Amino acid sequence: MIQPNNKPSLSIVILCYRSEEGIIGFIRQVEDELRIEGLEDYELVLVANYIAGQSDKTPDIVRQVASENPRAVPVIMEKHGGMGWDVISGFGAANGAVVALIDGDGQMPPKDIVRLWRVLKSGEFDFVKTFRKQRLDGSHRIFVSRWYNWLFHVLFPTSPYRDINSKPKLITRKALDQMQLHCSGWFLDGEIMLEVRRLNLSFAEVPTVFNNNEWRASFVNWKTALEMVSSMIEYRVHYWRE
């Protein structure tokens, strides 16, 4: 258990946006995997930011979870950005010596958090992530993802990473505190990877299986893909220096 005034070994930032009741089962799966591993010194940062006027039960569900679970840290604010804004707000609430980032929709297996934790705790790496060796989410999503990763490597040809948007991502606190993250939209994963490169962080990538989302439609479509590309090009032109 986390002792009063002590910081946890691991903070798990879970993006809960519009997950509603599905987030309850996902949290249970995460905690089951941590329990099997014998990892008790952790916190769950549950990011349930919302759009004003939009019907979404997730904030209330997360508040209820946090009232019953002392390891849960709720982050609930009216949204002033997209996915990146949620991630940055979650990072700001995380206190762990290691910070994990994962979506709460069940497509990324919770057991991967433990797999990456083991790799990171070896002390060899500052940053560890998955790459999706097998995908069960359909040909359309696979095509969009491959096209996006191809374009990323065209614009940033010396980037060695295999799968930019794959999660979980685990990073040491020291490395996270050095990152300059500003993207409020869908390119946040790309910005993280470019910061890994800028800071010359040691990293590892571990293969995983990416599941189909059984209980809600994905938020990733051609519109979000184009937003990611626009942000990628803007980053290439205005911010990145080889």
Regions found by a protein language model. Name each.
Residues D103-Q107:
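The conserved acidic donor/metal-binding loop of glycosyltransferases
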Residues S19-I23, Q54, P109:
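Donor nucleotide-sugar binding loop of glycosyltransferases
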Residues M1-L10, S19-E21, T158, L181-E242:
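Hydrophobic helical membrane-anchoring modules
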Residues V30-V75:
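Acidic donor-binding segment of Leloir-type glycosyltransferases
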